[in-house]
């Protein structure tokens, strides 16, 4: 039986952690002590110094020659069971998907062992359980986080290949990734160059696009055409990126009388549409500058029959209807251009689908720098056709739903990954629903070749061809090499990688030959690692305070995530531990460890790669709040 003294011991060890977290939360939300920039500095200190040195301290002082192999085997078996079930689910069921498999694996098997687990388990089951937790931390940092990174990079590589080489991927025999490309997470514009070798196979080079190196210099600067080609990752809907560029401050600084003159953003200058011609977005130019003669779409009539307004290049359902009205005013133009209609499937939807009507210009005649352009950018009016060139224009029509779920990538504008909003309905992004989307909707736009008519096709029109395209991938050895290159480049930039490996190497040397660390080095590490635990919880509190809401993904999804975290994980761990033969306190430690709150590193990866970040955010924040009573319930029940 668990005595009141045992409960008090546990609370004594855990409540101070929550005090640090609550102080950080109040410092931002209630007392306004820290600004977001200051919070960012604190979090960076914790990520680079405090947590790596804390993990180094625990790992270097733990005897690797006294590791409990059966306990490690049980933990490993739990993760293998979950991974195997998720692989089967993703490949052999209609509702399975790679994104959900990664998310469920993170929720069920990767708890916050370092910060929360070590002090909690030591208070519950003694010092030996703390040593077991350190062993779990070593495996997490060296093996399981690397595996998770491998899965994310596999997803990124698969998206890149499906977008750039939908028909010829099987002919790729090598990838060369330039040194400045760190990841395939979609943060940077990437372009691919394919060369045909003597053997008739493709040799692909992946590099950063010049557009990602440019900066938006000023409002009077005429945007120059970028050298973006069809072989480029545009990250339109798969990994939407929000910008911290403050347009209001920028325009005030440059002397504009009003606020932002239009919603033309720096990213738009180098988007898929703007690299092929001037495609202005709906502007509030006339509202701010009281220019009643300025048309709504930034379109300056030239009286020619070839003039037509440019629709919003973003896939936004809020501006689609307006764009259609403007396009329908010139029916002749609609008939003179090739058009492709994308059905969304025969199944009716609860939300009305809206028709997206847009034009795509060829990169051969980019009139942005050659012509006077739009008056918004300081150019003179063009008498020919109002600053627009319709040469090489291709017309695209597609039906898009008016709402999408967070974490699911459709051809609709999503909020930035840092917003964590809009996830109010629970649905797997599975194959059944994907059949109603445009082809490769989870990857954004298909490759738009300069000489093509942007032939976007729907999955419903492919039928059996979809399965054959999935098999149309490079050889496994080529894919593996590409992914390993990207994973290696990510790992060597992560301070936790060095702290874990150096700590393990030092422990192997120190406990083998009984070598003591020099006092100066030991005290230098100790003074920072001692603060690491409190600073990690403080940083978590800052993170909670900076979020718009604690439950960012909707109640139904949050309930599902908490069930996976606190029920599925411990249940699978119990099965694995019993199968390995753990009994007594070892079994209890294994189960309670599996019921710890969600780890922070999986959330960081989910945010970087934009794979259900709202769910992992809720798992970290809300999971931390309810973790103490849940672990106490497990502790009491297992002690009966």
Swiss-Prot record:
Protein name per the record: Auxin efflux carrier component 3
Topological region Extracellular: 1-7, 60-71, 123-131, 522-524, 581-585
Expression tissues: Predominantly expressed at the lateral side of shoot endodermis cells as well as root pericycle and columella cells.
Function: Acts as a component of the auxin efflux carrier; this activity is enhanced when activated by PID-mediated phosphorylation. Seems to be involved in the lateral auxin transport system. Together with PIN4 and PIN7, involved in the connective auxin transport (CAT) that ensures communication across the shoot system, and modulates strigolactone-mediated shoot branching control. Binds auxins including indole-3-acetic acid (IAA). Coordinated polar localization of PIN3 is directly regulated by the vesicle trafficking process.
Deleted gene: phenotype: Plants display defects in hypocotyl differential growth. The triple mutant pin3 pin4 pin7 is able to suppress partially the highly branched phenotype of strigolactone deficient mutants lacking MAX2 and MAX4. The abcb19 pin3 pin4 pin7 quadruple mutant exhibits an additive phenotype on strigolactone-mediated bud outgrowth responses and shoot branching control.
Biological processes annotated in GO: auxin export across the plasma membrane; auxin polar transport; auxin-activated signaling pathway; gravitropism; positive gravitropism; response to light stimulus; root development; root hair elongation
NCBIfam families per UniProt: 2a69
Activity: how regulated: Auxin efflux carrier activity is competitively inhibited by naptalamate (N-1-naphthylphthalamic acid, NPA).
Compartmental location: Cell membrane
Superkingdom of the organism of origin: Eukaryota
């Amino acid at each position: 039986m668990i005595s009141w003294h045992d409960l008090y011991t546990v609370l004594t060890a855990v409540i101070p952690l929550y005090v640090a977290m609550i102080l950080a939360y109040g410092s931002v939300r209630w007392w306004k002590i820290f600004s977001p920039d200051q919070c960012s500095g604190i979090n960076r200190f914790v990520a680079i110094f405090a947590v790596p040195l804390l993990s180094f301290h625990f790992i270097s002082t733990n005897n690797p020659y006294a590791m409990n192999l059966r306990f490690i085997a049980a933990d490993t078996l739990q993760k293998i069971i979950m991974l195997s079930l998720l692989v089967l689910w993703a490949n052999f069921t209609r509702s399975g998907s790679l994104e959900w498999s990664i998310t469920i694996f993170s929720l069920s098997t990767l708890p916050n062992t370092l910060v929360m687990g070590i002090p909690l388990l030591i208070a519950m089951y003694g010092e030996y359980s703390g040593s077991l937790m350190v062993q779990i931390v070593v495996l997490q940092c060296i093996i399981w986080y690397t595996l998770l990174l491998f899965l994310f990079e596999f997803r990124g590589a698969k998206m890149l290949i499906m977008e750039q080489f939908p028909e010829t991927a099987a002919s790729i025999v090598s990838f060369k990734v330039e040194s400045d490309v760190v990841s395939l997470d979609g943060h940077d514009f990437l372009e691919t160059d394919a060369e045909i070798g003597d053997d008739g196979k493709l040799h692909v080079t992946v590099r950063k696009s010049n557009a990602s190196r440019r900066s938006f210099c000023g409002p009077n600067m005429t945007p120059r055409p970028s050298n973006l080609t069809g072989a480029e990752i545009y990250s339109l809907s798969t990994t939407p990126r929000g910008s911290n560029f403050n347009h209001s401050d920028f325009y005030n600084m440059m002397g504009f009388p009003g606020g932002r003159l239009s919603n033309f953003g720096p990213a738009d200058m180098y988007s898929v549409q703007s690299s092929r011609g001037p495609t202005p977005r709906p502007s509030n130019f006339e509202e701010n500058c009281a220019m009643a003669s300025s048309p709504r779409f930034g379109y300056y009539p030239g009286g020619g029959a070839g003039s037509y307004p440019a629709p919003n290049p973003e896939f936004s359902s809020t501006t689609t209807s307006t764009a259609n009205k403007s396009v329908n005013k010139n029916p002749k133009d609609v008939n003179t251009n090739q058009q492709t209609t994308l059905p969304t499937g025969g199944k009716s939807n609860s939300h009305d689908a809206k028709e997206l009507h847009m034009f795509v210009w060829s990169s051969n005649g980019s009139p942005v720098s050659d012509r006077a352009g739009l008056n918004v950018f300081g150019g003179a009016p063009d008498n020919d056709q109002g600053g627009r060139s319709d040469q090489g224009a291709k017309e695209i029509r597609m039906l898009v739903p008016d709402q999408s779920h967070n974490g699911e990538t459709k051809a609709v504008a999503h909020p930035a990954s840092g917003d964590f909003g809009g996830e109010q309905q629970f649905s797997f992004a599975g194959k059944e629903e994907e059949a109603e989307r445009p082809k490769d909707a989870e990857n954004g736009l298909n490759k738009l070749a300069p000489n093509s008519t942007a032939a976007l096709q729907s999955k419903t029109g492919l039928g059996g061809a979809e399965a054959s395209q999935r098999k149309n991938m490079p050889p496994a050895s080529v894919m593996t090499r590409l992914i390993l290159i990207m994973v290696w480049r990510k790992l060597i930039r992560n301070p936790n990688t060095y702290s874990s490996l150096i700590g393990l190497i030092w422990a192997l040397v120190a406990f083998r030959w009984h070598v003591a660390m020099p006092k100066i080095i030991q005290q230098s590490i100790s003074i920072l690692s001692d603060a690491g635990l409190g600073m990690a919880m403080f940083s978590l509190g800052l993170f909670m305070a900076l979020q718009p809401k604690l439950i960012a993904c909707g109640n139904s999804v949050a309930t599902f995530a908490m069930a996976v975290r606190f029920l599925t994980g411990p249940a699978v761990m119990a099965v694995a531990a019993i199968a390995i033969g753990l009994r007594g306190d070892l079994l209890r430690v294994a189960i309670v460890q599996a019921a710890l709150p969600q780890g922070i590193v999986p959330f960081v990866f989910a945010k970087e790669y934009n794979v259900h970040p709202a769910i992992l955010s809720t798992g970290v924040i809300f999971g931390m709040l309810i973790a103490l009573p849940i672990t106490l319930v497990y502790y009491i029940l297992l002690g009966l």
